[in-house]
Amino acid sequence: MQVLSCSTDSRFVHKIWQEQELSKMVGGGFPFPMLSDAGGRIGAVYGVYDEAAGVDVRGRFIIDPDGIIQAIEMLTPPVGRKVGESLRQLQAFQHVRKTKGAEVCPAGWELGKPILKVGPELVGRVWEVWKPDE
């Protein structure tokens, strides 16, 4: 797994953001590389670059080892993301990949919680296995 942050801000803005903001919000600072996409080329490839404003909108992508996008989330600038939900989804995608799709993770699934085993015996019986409130 590799996590990267990418924005149209310069590496100098990232440095100040890390030192003055993130280090106070996240113990030890942001633990992942921050990429500068000053021209918006990376953002344009992923459809998050706003050319008129010269910035990327908030986007999150989970890309599997084969380079296939498994999840996309795009938010307008005033709304932040929840890191825990991103981590939960990443763990779910990793689990499904590890089992080659023989096991799937239901909505709200968390590491260590029951999974669903794909097969005809599950049809019409999901409610017996999946208890979202537990």
Over which residues does each language-model region extend?
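Chalcogenol-based redox active-site neighborhoods
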Residues: M1-E134
